[in-house]
């Protein structure tokens, strides 16, 4: 175990916690409660930093920690909360009783972030589709305005990108299997490919 002397302070242990250290911290917090972790470290006799004590208690020692794999309901809640809050793991973990923010973050990074539909669900509400040629997100008129871009004339990005294929595409012309949103954004059904819209000659 490494010990480091900080200027004007006593030695601070680093590295793995020993079972006897866990017992000291657990016993002290159960007797005196949580509070100033640097003070807890000093009063309990542990030669650990306050942050180290806090994280050890929060992630490993507190009695209400839930162990075991995530349930489907917990997975679904993590995906929905991440879509709403982003990487604010402590807030997400607050909605999952017994789960720590560190556990939720690790679970997201190892299991959920790699799933294609979780990435899709995680896209901001204002990005509702992608152009079939560049795979760039199609932004809503409101989002373009907030970025200082034009409105109606810039809603035709997809139309301009199809022109070099020699197809006669006009704004407002009906195309099958394309959804029109109120803000003129086009959304393609991902079940169909480019050739479903434009057969190759």
UniProtKB/Swiss-Prot annotation:
Q: Where is the HTH myb-type domain?
A: 9-61, 62-116
Entry-linked SMART domains = SANT (SM00717)
**Alphabetized GO MF terms:** DNA binding
Give the principal location in a single coarse category.
nucleus
User: Region (Disordered) spans which residues?
Assistant: 112-133
Q: What induces it?
A: By auxin (IAA).
DNA-binding region residues: the ranges are 37-61, 89-112
PROSITE patterns found in the cross-reference section:
HTH_MYB
Q: Which GO terms describe its cellular component?
A: nucleus
Q: What domain of life does the native source organism fall in?
A: Eukaryota
Q: Which GO terms describe its biological process?
A: positive regulation of DNA-templated transcription; trichome differentiation
Give its localization.
Answer: Nucleus
Enumerate the Pfam families for this protein.
Myb_DNA-binding
Q: Which controlled-vocabulary keywords does the entry list?
A: Developmental protein, DNA-binding, Nucleus, Repeat, Transcription, Transcription regulation
Q: What does the function comment of this entry state?
A: Transcription activation factor positively regulating trichomes development. Has a function nearly equivalent to that of GL1 and can complement gl1 mutants.
**Subunit notes for this chain?**
Homodimer and heterodimer with GL1. Part of the WD40-bHLH-MYB complex. Interacts with BHLH012/MYC1 and BHLH042/TT8. Interacts (via N-terminus) with GL1 and GL3.
Name this polypeptide is given: Transcription factor MYB82
Q: Which gene encodes it?
A: MYB82
């Amino acid at each position: 175990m490494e010990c480091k002397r900080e200027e004007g302070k006593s030695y601070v242990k680093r590295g793995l916690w020993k079972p006897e250290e866990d017992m000291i911290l657990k016993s002290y917090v159960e007797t005196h409660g949580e509070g100033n972790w640097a003070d807890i470290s000093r009063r309990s006799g542990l030669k650990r930093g306050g942050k180290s004590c806090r994280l050890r208690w929060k992630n490993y020692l507190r009695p209400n920690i839930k162990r075991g794999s995530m349930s489907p309901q917990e997975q679904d809640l993590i995906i929905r909360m991440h879509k709403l809050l982003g990487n604010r793991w402590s807030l997400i973990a607050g909605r999952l009783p017994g789960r720590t923010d560190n556990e939720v973050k690790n679970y997201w990074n190892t299991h959920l972030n790699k799933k294609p539909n979780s990435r899709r669900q995680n896209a901001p509400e204002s990005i509702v589709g992608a152009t079939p040629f560049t795979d760039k997100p199609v932004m809503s008129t409101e989002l373009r305005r907030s970025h200082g871009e034009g409105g109606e004339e810039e809603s035709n990005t997809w139309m301009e990108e199809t022109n070099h294929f020699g197809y006669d595409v006009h704004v407002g012309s009906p195309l099958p299997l394309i959804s029109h949103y109120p803000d003129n954004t086009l959304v393609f059904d991902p079940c169909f490919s480019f050739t479903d819209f434009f057969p190759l000659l």
